[in-house]
Amino acid sequence: MPRMKDIPTKSSPGTDNSEKDEAVIEEDLSLNGQPFFTDNTDGGENEVSWTSSLLSTYVGCQPPAIPVCETVIDLTAPSQSGAPGDEHLPCSLNAETKFHIPDPSWTLSHTPPRGPHISQQLPTRRSKRRLHRKFEEERLCTKAKQGAGRPVPASVVKVGNITPHYGEELTRGDAVPAAPITPPYPRVQRPAQPTHVLFSPVFVSLKAEVCDQSHSPTRKQGRYGRVSSKAYTRQLQQALEEKDAQLCFLAARLEAHKEQIIFLRDMLMRMCQQPASPTDAPLPPC
């Protein structure tokens, strides 16, 4: 880089030498003896063409969207809605606020935390899980211990002054009998299926003991009134037999309807083939 003392100075025409002269830096804009601008155009025009060619690769790209909020944000004031997560939003969303989010990806990357801060959260109160009345009574009966921490059978339990729903008032030392087990499934009355087909020339009869569904299957109750696997298998087998009987009944009705349709078609063909008498009204064409 040339020094300031080596820079030649020249005065502008029409001015005195006492005026401040302009310092003209004449540097050789060349690189290894070759000019910097290869073409014969001006440097400014070449710079414009270089900028336009560089920006042509970014055609179609949009800058990242910036959310716009046209209200004054007061982060210290509580929200009007009272929601726990409103204080973390960029602004209050009311009727006068115009909040625009052009790019939905902004909401994904700036999701506000749910609820208040962890220091402001109160301990969650969880209610104690309540058992069924039957299991609760058994738990209270077996809570009394006998000997060195051994559980007492539910049939004979030493308890205090209690009044069960199935017994009288007891005193300490009396034996509490086991609670009676009630059947869990009430008997359901099902309507019996008809044993014949109406409006058919063929009378179809089925056995009453096959179509009768009024009887309920036998159930073997366990300790808590549950059905054993054998009884459940027996119930499924009986239900399958009932479905088979219903299918047989529907198949018989279908055959009866087919025969009835054939009978009506034959009657209609005979009526069309008979010559019409002059006294009778004319029949429509078949």
Swiss-Prot record:
An annotated Gene Ontology molecular function: transferase activity
EC numbers, comma separated: 2.3.2.-
Keyword flag Ubl conjugation: yes
Pathway per the UniProt entry: Protein modification; protein sumoylation
PTM (free text): Sumoylated.
Any GO BP: bidirectional double-stranded viral DNA replication
Subunit: Interacts with host HDAC1 and HDAC2, these interactions suppress HDAC activities. Interacts with protein ORF57. Interacts with protein vPK.
Enzyme class, broadest EC rank: transferase
Family matches, as InterPro entries: KSHV_K8
Region (Disordered): 1-22, 106-130
Xref: Pfam families: KSHV_K8 (PF07188)
Function according to Swiss-Prot or TrEMBL: SUMO E3 ligase that plays a role in viral gene regulation and is essential for viral reactivation. Disrupts host G1 cell cycle control thus allowing viral transcription and translation to proceed at the early stages of infection. Catalyzes its own SUMO modification as well as that of its interacting partners such as host TP53 and RB1. Regulates viral gene expression and reactivation and may mediate the SUMOylation of viral promoters in the low methylated 'Lys-9' histone H3 (H3K9me) region which results in a diminution of viral gene expression after reactivation.
Keywords associated with the record: G1/S host cell cycle checkpoint dysregulation by virus, Host-virus interaction, Modulation of host cell cycle by virus, Transferase, Ubl conjugation, Ubl conjugation pathway
Domain of life: Viruses
Gene encoding the protein: K8
The name this protein goes by in its record: E3 SUMO-protein ligase K-bZIP
Taxonomic placement: Viruses, Duplodnaviria, Heunggongvirae, Peploviricota, Herviviricetes
